[in-house]
């Protein structure tokens, strides 16, 4: 998991430099991450696409098993409970937005 997260951050920074130049800034990194399209870290993770509307990248995972020498996929990439997750995200976001306008 740590390697996967680092690879996403590294690729986002690489794209930020390629598209926005040096030095890196928070806005350039955000733009770099939001330009990830079907990035899979050479098969380490499910292909992700990050947009301004969806920073989750797709939310897919798979079950793997160690065979004594390597990790072997036991399932295809799956996105479990996405309907439930997005329902809660939208509800909580609406509640937060409402509370902010009442301040």
Regions found by a protein language model. Give the residues of each.
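Extracytosolic ligand-binding ectodomains
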Residues: 1-103
């Amino acid at each position: 998991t740590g390697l996967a997260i680092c690879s996403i951050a590294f690729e986002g920074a690489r794209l930020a430099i390629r598209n926005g130049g040096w030095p890196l800034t928070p806005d350039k990194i955000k733009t770099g991450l939001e330009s990830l399209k079907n990035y899979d870290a050479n098969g380490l993770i499910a292909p992700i696409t990050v947009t301004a509307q969806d920073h989750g990248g797709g939310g897919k995972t798979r079950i793997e098993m160690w065979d004594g020498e390597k990790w072997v996929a036991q399932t295809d990439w799956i996105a479990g409970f996405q309907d439930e997750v997005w329902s809660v995200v939208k509800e909580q976001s609406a509640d937060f937005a409402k509370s902010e306008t009442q301040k």
